[in-house]
């Protein structure tokens, strides 16, 4: 969000991996470190956070520089010049991607009342963080008490989750 605007902001961000331009991404220019880690995990470029040796976002919030402990091959063949990970954009390069996703097997439940409390808390936090409109939000709850949460928001709904 811009300090003088009540509308959500979107910017074209360049993502460099090991000194090479990997792609351009359209997203809200906030929480870019967290976004980069989630995006790299989601694309299968890294398998865990520890694969990243360093990660820096430039002061102008237009470039993300990531150095990995391993080389990645065929960068230019895997990604389009601009990734639009939100509505109507984005890409999954292969249906094989879905075959590698493991089914979640969990007995975890969230009573309806707890879900309502969590949603209310999420929207209160969102109002404090971003008083404007035109954004999507997502939260990850603390499994123990369902109240502690990490909030993410972005112009693109998929980016809010990443």
Located regions from the model:
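Intrinsically disordered, low-complexity regions enriched in acidic/Ser/Thr/Pro/Gln residues
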Residues: 1-151
